[in-house]
Design a protein with these regions (language model features):
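Bacterial N-terminal signal peptides
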Residues: 9-18
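Early extracytoplasmic/domain-onset interaction patches
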Residues: 23-83
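C-terminal single-pass membrane-anchor helix
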Residues: 250-295
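Bacterial N-terminal signal peptides that target proteins for export
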Residues: 1-8
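Hydrophobic residues positioned within well-ordered beta-strands of beta-sheet architectures
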Residues: 49-53, 64-66, 80-82, 94, ...
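Solvent-exposed beta-hairpin/edge-strand motifs
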Residues: 83-119, 190-213
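Intrinsically disordered, low-complexity linkers and stems that provide flexible hinges
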Residues: 133-135, 142-152, 165-169, 174-259
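Extended, solvent-exposed segments with strong compositional bias
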Residues: 111-140, 150-152
Length: 295
């Protein structure tokens, strides 16, 4: 009877202590930063023959470096303003170089909201909002402008580099974790004589898998992917990265939703187990009592 009383007390305690589930909602996914290929005024005189785009992901951020091979296809000196969209210029991490030499640049800021869109103003690409005014909840995107000077027939490498914040849920430590990268390639439609595009994607151990992308990447190394083409894609670059299967499984058990579900289901399950144990004990006692009565 002592075992019966103990099991009964445990079952009653678990029943009384059963938690009331608390609703929890995931925050909206984080919007990715905005980055773009370069555009320039003298597209009639300068050709971009090659772009090498390196995207190196570390945690919830990426370092984007774009190298452009540009040639003055005229027999006269050419000077032109150049621009591209980039985030995070305020921390001084943006770099612009011409054949390895740093160039000075200026920045204009635009408000970025859910209804923002990329539009052209002559040769320029700018991010605009419906009313042109920033609200408290809006992010800012920067338009970087710099000057290039080319001698007749000169070929040079222009390189731009900046940090980039991933969209999605890159900071989560459970199975909702994922990252989104978006990069505007459409400004490159203004280029001429284009011959080669290479996109190198370097992922880290936290999100080592490409879940989906607008271009077909090929795996060329550990967490390293590459896309090459002799033409520009017809759409902007979008990349969705995620955890692998093992990480997803571990992340499932880290999820607050999973823990809440277990907390809700575990007490009833234990009560059922306790009742089964009680029933087994009672049946054993009944059987034992019957055996004694036959003696």
């Amino acid at each position: 009877m002592k075992a019966l009383r103990t099991v009964s007390a445990l079952a009653l305690t678990l029943l009384l202590l059963q938690p009331i589930p608390v609703s929890a909602n995931m925050a909206a996914p984080q919007d990715p930063d905005v980055g773009s290929s370069i555009t320039f005024q003298r597209s009639d005189a300068l050709a971009v023959t090659e772009e090498v785009l390196d995207i190196t992901v570390t945690g919830s951020t990426a370092q984007i470096t774009a190298a452009y091979t540009m040639t003055n296809i005229t027999q006269e000196a050419v000077s032109t303003p150049v621009m591209f969209l980039a985030p995070n210029t305020g921390d001084g991490s943006v770099e612009v170089t011409l054949d390895g030499e740093a160039l000075s640049w200026s920045v204009d800021q635009y408000a970025l909201s859910f209804d923002s869109k990329v539009e052209t103003e002559d040769w320029r690409y700018a991010v605009l909002t419906a009313d042109g005014e920033r609200t408290f909840s809006e992010e800012l995107v920067d338009a970087i402008t710099f000057q290039l000077d080319f001698d007749p027939g000169e070929t040079s490498e222009v390189k731009v580099s900046y940090p980039y914040r991933l969209g999605g849920y890159p900071d989560y430590d459970w199975n909702a974790k994922r990252g989104v990268i978006y990069y505007y390639l459409t400004p490159a439609a203004l280029w001429q004589d284009f011959q080669s595009l290479t996109i190198n994607l370097y992922l880290d151990k936290d999100m080592p898998v490409i879940k989906d992308s607008s271009v077909p990447f090929e795996k060329v190394g550990t967490r390293t992917y590459q896309y090459t083409s002799d033409t520009l894609p017809q759409e902007d670059l979008s990349i969705f990265i995620d955890e692998n299967v093992v990480q997803e499984t571990i992340g499932f058990f880290r999820s607050p939703y999973t823990r809440m579900l277990f907390a809700f289901l575990l007490p009833p399950v234990l009560v059922v187990v306790a009742l089964i144990v009680i029933l087994i004990i009672i049946l054993k006692k009944i059987r034992k009592h019957k055996n004694k009565s036959h003696l």
